[in-house]
């Protein structure tokens, strides 16, 4: 199979990369009615599989789970989760032939095997759904021409998808129809009904493409969302300890610092995050972020180039074929780092202390978010898509680090995200070491003293922060998410 994106001509590539339309709430007036009375069979009962299924059932849809015979016979976790929640469970052979919509919510590396198994069992004119388009775009999976292929991609982990639905809300969602597989022209109606059934229409839905979702998703998770947080954690911890900070305190400042800092980012973008600093600290954070952007821009661009060309995907799929040798080696090495093995700090760190003593961390967040956004937009991805794949998801990933450090982040994210994270962080750490050696007192671990600032300089800096394109589009998109619950900040 050939990488689908690479089979397109340049005009088609640009058209699909640039497909992005914010859908009006009136477009979802019919809710999930298009799928009511039809049989929806979900393959996979992980975090997305279970929680999307729960939401869809609560929205009045007929939901069941198709699992492998061994999973049922051995009563594995997927079988237990589905049955304990009262769902009908059966084998592929029992459930797939009667399904109107088959939703493949297994991990990326299982998609080809799953599709090859279910496709011969699917009835004529059925639909196949994904929540990530890697199998279609990067693997180049060929789907029978009578089958409609759609995507509904919530921009949150599965647990958040469920929690927001239970609150009567939802999470921002991308939907798409594969242009090669919409024989009856009903793909958009199916995708809209599925998105409404998960609650996504209450938080904002982007009509996108499989290509735009995949390329932007890979870029965000590799760079700012996971790679930058991992590289930043390792670099900042080592710097603090090198300068005499208690390792336990240093570990806590970083582990919970990302979460605290990005909570401000979630509520009010880079503007609010920077406003949490004193004026002298804000000036310094801005200067550091500009230095970081200049240093890291070529690395961000390389990742985007490798994602666009398919170089990243081919390398990762080669590792899949080699029993994940690289991935597992990198995972083991990360677990042995000083940050991951540091003792726990039992004392309290106040919320403002994370900002005052984390000026460098704030600069890293600002630089990483802006670079990821700018690099995606320069590659033809529309600003709304770039926002969701950079700034929007960052607090959610930071929250995983607050739970169990980098280990938890790498467990929760997909194997695809984890592989890309290691590629980025392994390149970024040595790249930034000379920069780290030139830091000043107050950049990390100590507060910058209050002092006089130049009013004109501060005015211009504030204007530069607020006028960045990600702040402009972010203000609009956050307006649709005002009801989303505040992520709990650990102390």
Swiss-Prot record:
Source species: Escherichia coli O157:H7
Domain (KARI N-terminal Rossmann) ranges: 15-208
Originating gene: ilvC
An annotated Gene Ontology molecular function: magnesium ion binding
EC number: 1.1.1.86
Required cofactor names: Mg(2+)
Details of cofactor binding: Binds 2 magnesium ions per subunit.
Family annotation (HAMAP family): IlvC (MF_00435)
Gene Ontology CC: cytosol
Binding site for substrate: 414
GO BP term (any one): L-valine biosynthetic process
InterPro entries listed in its UniProt record: 6-PGluconate_DH-like_C_sf, 6PGD_dom2, KARI, KARI_C, KARI_N, NAD(P)-bd_dom_sf
Binding residues for Mg(2+) 2: 217, 389, 393
Protein name (database record): Ketol-acid reductoisomerase (NADP(+))
Keywords of this entry: Amino-acid biosynthesis, Branched-chain amino acid biosynthesis, Magnesium, Metal-binding, NADP, Oxidoreductase, Repeat
UniProt record similarity statement: Belongs to the ketol-acid reductoisomerase family.
Function according to Swiss-Prot or TrEMBL: Involved in the biosynthesis of branched-chain amino acids (BCAA). Catalyzes an alkyl-migration followed by a ketol-acid reduction of (S)-2-acetolactate (S2AL) to yield (R)-2,3-dihydroxy-isovalerate. In the isomerase reaction, S2AL is rearranged via a Mg-dependent methyl migration to produce 3-hydroxy-3-methyl-2-ketobutyrate (HMKB). In the reductase reaction, this 2-ketoacid undergoes a metal-dependent reduction by NADPH to yield (R)-2,3-dihydroxy-isovalerate.
